[in-house]
């Protein structure tokens, strides 16, 4: 049973959001979490469920390809709409496979070796050979990832937002990579930001944000925030 507590934001009646943090190639954990969400929905049906993945599907873990291909295949939960957001690791992977030399180096040192290997590629082979191992359908999925999604009083992004900057003009770089100036901000953003990117031992609930990266790939948990009405709970695998 999910233990709910007061949330800093609110969703309209009949709406429930399941938001999953950074996956990083931990495919088995993701399958288990999807199954747990399905069980919760069967026990507690709701009119308007939504599944959100906040990005960083690839790198570090053993099965980036499996994660991407599962999500690219369509809604993992039947009849539950799904929003897939981009993380900084997807952005780096895309740029690396498009031939950006600096991004290729960054990708390899931030977990890209494991990711490329999961697609059958050789990280030590010429960089010009890498792209051929990643199917076009997977690249199309990655390129089409959204940067943000808002429901009720919640804004879902990968990393966070720049305090003092209007939501409509936030830069891609900040949405994908921001840390301290967002994490330690005492500003009311006008929405509660649900984000990943910065791993913590447990989910973080602040008045202006909820952090759900709990370091699954670093022997932590894969976390799903369950948002409903004025409450929040968590499912972990």
Placement of each model-derived feature along the sequence:
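Short glycine- and acidic-rich boundary segments immediately preceding or forming the N-terminal edge
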Residues: 1-32
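A short acidic-Thr-Gly-centered motif at the start of a beta-strand
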Residues: 3-13, 42-44, 72-76, 147-150, ...
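Active-site environment of divalent metal-dependent phosphoester hydrolases
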Residues: 25-28, 59-62, 89-94, 163-164, ...
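Core catalytic region of metal-dependent phosphoesterases/phosphodiesterases
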Residues: 26-105
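Acidic, His/Gly-enriched loop-helix segments that form or flank divalent-metal centers
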Residues: 106-211, 215-221, 227-237
